[in-house]
Design a protein with these regions (language model features):
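Conserved ATP-driven motor cores of ASCE-family P-loop NTPases powering translocation/secretion/packaging/pilus
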Residues: 96-169
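P-loop NTPase motor domains
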Residues: 1-97, 163, 167-169
């Protein structure tokens, strides 16, 4: 179905990615011609992050408090996050688990989306730091401010943002 899947591979490309991360090399996945195939996009991202989850949990637990043996901090950035974190999909991917649990394993989830209201509320509630630009939809504003103290005052600030301005919440 996908040209990138092979019945037999010469090496493990995920292991190569993990070695680059161990060497503190930044990795960017670009889906090229498969970028518009949502099922391929979710399959690859979910497969890769499940392996990352497994490796980081294992490395952190094997470190037994030895900071030098712990895995390097990792930030997983997901653009168009609603594709992975929408309420119907989030439960079937590893991203909800990462948002909830992996900070203690040196992994942070950084989500980017223009429609935060389409992201599962249980995931949004786990996001500690939020950066937002101007939002026009009331439900998107509500989603960004969910669980934030002083949300009423912040709502006014968000409504006054101009193009190219952001608010750190």
């Amino acid at each position: 179905k996908y040209g990138f899947l092979k019945p037999k591979a010469l090496d493990d490309s995920v292991d190569r990615i993990l070695k680059h991360l161990d060497a503190r090399t930044h990795i960017v996945l670009e889906f090229g011609r498969y970028g518009n195939m949502l099922d391929a996009y979710i399959f690859v991202a979910n497969f890769l992050t499940r392996r990352l989850h497994q490796k980081y949990v294992e490395k952190k637990e094997n470190a037994f408090g030895n900071k030098a043996a712990e895995p390097a901090p990792l930030v997983i950035t997901i653009e168009e996050a609603h594709k992975f974190l929408d309420p119907q999909i989030a439960g079937h991917t590893i991203f909800g688990t990462i948002a909830r649990e992996l900070r203690k394993y040196n992994v942070t989830l950084f989500i980017v989306d223009q429609r935060p209201s389409q992201i599962a509320p249980e995931v949004m509630s786990q996001i500690g730091t939020r950066v937002t630009a101007l939002l026009d939809e009331e439900n998107d504003i509500r989603a960004v401010l969910m669980g934030v103290s002083g949300a009423a005052g912040l709502k006014e600030v968000l409504a006054r943002l101009e193009t190219r301005q952001q608010a750190l919440i």
